[in-house]
Amino acid sequence: MHPSLYITGAGVSAESGIPTFRGQDGFWTIGSANYTPQQMATRAMYMQRPAEFLLWYYRRFAQYRHLQPNRVHRWLADKKLITQNIDGLDGKAGNVDYIPIHGRLDKVTVLHDQGAEVELLDAPWQQVADNQDAPNDDGHLKTALLDAFRISSTTQTPQMNQSLKPFVLLFDEYYTELYRMSVAQNWLLSATKMVFIGTSFSVGITDIALQCALQNNAPVHIVDPDPVDLGVDGIHYHRMTAAEFIASQ
């Protein structure tokens, strides 16, 4: 059996300055229409409107790539950890074998059929930054992004096995081995205790994890200032921030 397994969400990285992008702050405007993160973060949006998708991804995530881990990341550095966050801060904090189950901001892949074996490549964010004539001009930024991601600015159609796609699990995609899903399932099934920190239980991995814990009678702890009531008996709720929780341990 593995020791305690920690499963983290956006609440852990908030102290580092990364917004959670839920609620009003998460809306994105294209023309006169507002889109939610659930509408923007889709494979369909990437395929149909790659310039808008990449601009959204850059503004909402890539521009925070230089931020540093906080005390919670450092506390988790020697823990068995699955994170929903793509910011890579757990790796920066020194956790050498954590699972970024939704991908990593600093990596991309070639566009491929889901489930195919592909190599992780370094994300071309610096190339994008270097090629911006006017950093605050969305038009120039879109051109730089399309070029860096190998997408024709004329056709604006991503090409299979040629164009690049951010290494991120989108809402209309599913978990594959690219995201180390088999290893994650092994950890979930063999955990003696699960501690969820800063997650709203709004994505698939948290539901899978909770079911594994209940199946194995593993204690479940939820750390959140305003936790979601899961309606399950026996769950230990810690109504506090992640920083307050680690200070109490």
Feature-to-residue mapping (PLM):
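Conserved catalytic core of sirtuin-type NAD+-dependent deacylases
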Residues: 1-249
